[in-house]
Amino acid sequence: MIYKVFYQEKADEVPVREKTDSLYIEGVSERDVRTKLKEKKFNIEFITPVDGAFLEYEQQSENFKVLEL
């Protein structure tokens, strides 16, 4: 399953909405995704599964790239 992860680059700073980035990553569960991203030192705000019509919509974006770890 593909997950969309909303995160801040620096885990040691207070989260600011305007600095939130997102990425797409494949995993079997939210826990699996968190484990894969642990070494990145991101401040993960939210992880949501992407499938069905939502996935089709996201794939239309030029920024849609699934992170390979």
Curated annotation (Swiss-Prot):
It is found in: Cytoplasm, Nucleoid. The keyword Nucleotidyltransferase applies. Keywords: Cytoplasm, DNA-directed RNA polymerase, Nucleotidyltransferase, Transcription, Transferase. It catalyses: RNA(n) + a ribonucleoside 5'-triphosphate = RNA(n+1) + diphosphate. GO terms for molecular function: DNA binding; DNA-directed RNA polymerase activity. Its main location: cytoplasm. The keyword Nucleotidyltransferase applies. Transmembrane segments: none annotated. One of its GO terms (cellular component) is nucleoid. Induction: Part of the rpoY-rnjA operon, transcribed constitutively. GO terms for biological process: DNA-templated transcription. HAMAP family: RNApol_bact_RpoY. Belongs to the RNA polymerase subunit epsilon family. A non-essential component of RNA polymerase (RNAP). Has a similar structure to bacteriophage T7 protein Gp2 (AC P03704), which is known to bind to RNAP in the DNA binding-cleft. Unlike Gp2 however, this protein does not inhibit transcription initiation. In vitro reconstitution experiments show this subunit is dispensible. This is DNA-directed RNA polymerase subunit epsilon. It comes from Bacillus subtilis (strain 168).
